[in-house]
Structures are given as C-alpha cells and as structure tokens.
C-alpha cells in the first residue's frame, strides 16, 4: 500500500483536493440558489439579501481556505491554544445568551450575523487535539487532554445538537486511535460517549419521538414525525433516473422543510435524478479519498493527525446527511458539506479543507510561511 501512496505526486493530491472542493462548492451554490425561494418566508430575508449573505460566507470561507493553505506549522502551533479557548468560550456564551430555534439553543448573533460556535469547535478539536498530544505525549496526560476536549462536547450535547456531537466524537476518536491511545482508555471513553449520546436522545422529546415513530412503530404520522423524511423520499423517488428538472421539482413548492440545508441531496435527487445524486456522491468519494491520501503521505505525526480528523469530519457529515435524507439515520440537522447552505459551517469546512490541501502539497504542514511544494521523493523515483 505504501508503494501505491508513494507513486502519487503530493502536488497532484493537493490539486485534486482543491478541485473537488471547488466543484462541490459550485454545485451547492447552484442548487441552493434554485431552492431557497420557499424558505425565504421563514428567514425574513429577500432573495437578494439571502444571496448576498450566502456570498459573504462563501467569500469568508475562501479566505479561510487560502489562509489555512498558506499557514505554516509554527504559526498554527502558536494560534491553536487561542482557537481552542475562543471556541470553548463561544460555546459557553451560547448557553448563556444564545438564540433558540425549534427548541435548540445553538446560535449567537454578532453584528447582525448568526454564528454557530459548535461548528468552530469542530475545527478547534481537529487542530488542538494533535497539538496537545504532541506537547504532552504521556498516555496519562493524553487521557486528560481528551477528557478536556469533551467539556466542549458536553456543551454541544446540552444545546442540544446530537449530530454535531456525533461528528466531534468521531473526530476525537479517529485522532486518538491514530495517535495510539491505549485500547482500554479508548474503549472507556467510547462507552461514556455512547451513554451520553443515548442520554441526550432520551432528554430530547422530539428526537426520541422521531426515532421511536420511524424505527420502532408500526405506524408513523405522515404529517408529524415522519413528514420531513417522507417528503424527502418522495422527492428522491420522483426524480427517477434523470430527474424532473429544476422547473418541475416539488421542492420548489415548499413541501420539504429545510430543503436548502438538511435535505439538499433530496433536491438534487428530484431535480437531477439518480444520475445527479451519483455524481455528487462520487465527488465526495473523490474528495475524501484524496484527503485520506494527504493523511497517508504526511511525514510528521501532527499533520497526519489533523488530516485524519479532517477526513473523518467531512466524510462523516456527508454520510450522515445523505443517510438522514433517505431515512436510514435520524434527522439531526447535519448539513451536506460545501453543498448545503450554511454560514459558519461553510467557513470552517473550507478552512479544514485548506489545511488538508496544505498538508497534501507539502507532505505535512509547511515548515515556513513560504510556499514550498515538494519534489518527487527518492522512494517515488525508485519505484
């Protein structure tokens, strides 16, 4: 396997990550722009205002992508404690002054912009956990560090936000597993996380009722708990092989709530059919594969840990979003990375992909602030 990895030019891996990111972003902008009409009444925005807001976050995300692509390992190391501290403080602020929507308190408003700190926390864990593990490498200290990262996860579960909690947990587990945490510690933490997740579901009436109705009940109210999933399935099914086309999609009539966020893949399935969904899934498989290649080619452990965490992050969110759209997984509010409309999520997704492209191009985070693309390694030449 290592011989196969060695034959792939790191610069090409980086270009593929950048290209896959750009194509998925373009798909998302196109589909969201066609879908947003029925949701404007809920947002209180005009179409122009909504598109300007979407454009603002995309531009901010592209700036984050560029900054993360150029950042060096020493620079990121200096910024990491600040990033983690700010993200935890923002989560605390949500519990005190956050805005509540549909029973969940996940957002804070700053200067007219609504931000979701739990999204920032994903990025913080992805860079802070590897940094802390390398700084305090003893296994005992590593366990304490992981428990400290779970403080933020606890805040997220109390919002409540089951989907983000799952993704943060998977990021942490993948990083700790790759680092080599003892299995008994890892198993104990997984058990605690599982109990906490089940307890969180039990505390959320709407989530508990939705899961019971969909998976354990012989009848599910088509106008209640099963409404979103049913409408999502109807949309995907009506798309057939090649889709109805944008002009005839039922999603434009407002039948499917949150079509531009949680259920964007259903809109793609209805408008462009199985062919469209397959292309989008293929693009994600392409992107995730080369993100994984970036991790495998990284020459230093911190870069590999960041790349593993970022790959699991994007892959888990894509899988959960698609699974919830077809009713395999409970609806948790996880957006489809780069494709769904999202402010904070868009920025941090582009940021972590910028880091992955950086790691791919340099076989690890670049050591200086200057752009330094590697030449073909000796092992690649000999193979």
What residue ranges belong to the model's regions?
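N-terminal export and membrane-targeting signals
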Residues: 8-21
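A juxtamembrane structural motif centered on a specific transmembrane helix
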Residues: 1-4, 319-383
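Cytosolic juxtamembrane amphipathic/interface segments immediately preceding
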Residues: 1-10, 45
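Transmembrane helix boundary and interhelical junction motifs in multipass membrane proteins
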Residues: 161-166, 244-249, 259-261, 278, ...
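Hydrophobic alpha-helical transmembrane segments of multi-pass inner membrane proteins, especially
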Residues: 18-34, 38-230, 266-324, 351-355, ...
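Glycine/serine-rich anion-binding loops at beta->alpha junctions
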Residues: 111-121, 158-160, 240-245, 334-348
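TM-adjacent membrane-interface loops and short helices in multi-pass inner/ER membrane proteins
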Residues: 217-261, 272-276
């Amino acid at each position: 396997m290592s011989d196969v990895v060695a034959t792939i030019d790191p610069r090409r891996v980086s270009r593929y990550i950048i290209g896959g990111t750009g194509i998925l972003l373009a798909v998302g902008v196109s589909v969201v722009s066609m879908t947003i009409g029925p949701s404007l009444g809920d947002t209180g925005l005009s179409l122009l205002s909504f598109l300007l807001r979407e454009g603002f976050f995309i531009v901010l995300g592209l700036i984050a992508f560029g900054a993360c692509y150029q950042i060096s390992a020493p620079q990121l190391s200096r910024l990491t404690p600040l990033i983690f501290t700010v993200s935890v403080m923002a989560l605390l602020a949500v519990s005190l002054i956050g805005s509540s929507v549909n029973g969940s308190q996940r957002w804070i408003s700053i200067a007219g912009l609504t931000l979701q700190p739990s999204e920032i926390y994903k990025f913080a864990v992805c860079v802070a956990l590897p940094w802390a593990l390398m700084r305090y490498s003893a296994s005992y200290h590593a366990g304490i560090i992981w428990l400290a990262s779970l403080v933020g996860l606890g805040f997220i579960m109390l919002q409540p936000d089951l989907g983000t909690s799952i993704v943060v947990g998977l990021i942490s587990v993948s990083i700790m597993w790759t680092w080599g945490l003892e299995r008994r510690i890892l198993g104990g933490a997984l058990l605690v996380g599982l109990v906490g997740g089940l307890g969180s579901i039990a505390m959320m009436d709407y989530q508990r009722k939705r899961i019971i109705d969909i998976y354990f009940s012989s009848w599910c109210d088509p106008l209640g708990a099963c409404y979103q999933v049913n409408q999502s399935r109807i949309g995907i099914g009506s798309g057939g092989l090649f889709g109805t086309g944008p002009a005839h999609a039922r999603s434009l009539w407002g039948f499917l709530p949150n079509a531009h966020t949680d259920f964007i893949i259903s809109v793609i399935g209805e408008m462009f059919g199985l062919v469209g969904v397959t292309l989008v899934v293929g693009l994600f498989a392409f992107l995730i594969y080369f993100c994984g290649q970036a991790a495998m080619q990284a020459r230093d452990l911190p870069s590999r840990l960041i790349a593993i965490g970022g790959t699991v992050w994007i892959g888990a969110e894509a899988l959960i979003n698609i699974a919830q759209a077809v009713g395999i997984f409970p609806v948790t509010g996880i957006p489809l990375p780069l494709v769904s409309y999202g402010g904070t999520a868009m920025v941090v997704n582009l940021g972590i992909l910028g880091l992955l492209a950086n790691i791919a191009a340099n076989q690890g985070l670049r050591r200086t602030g200057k752009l330094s693309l590697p030449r073909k390694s000796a092992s690649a030449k000999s193979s």
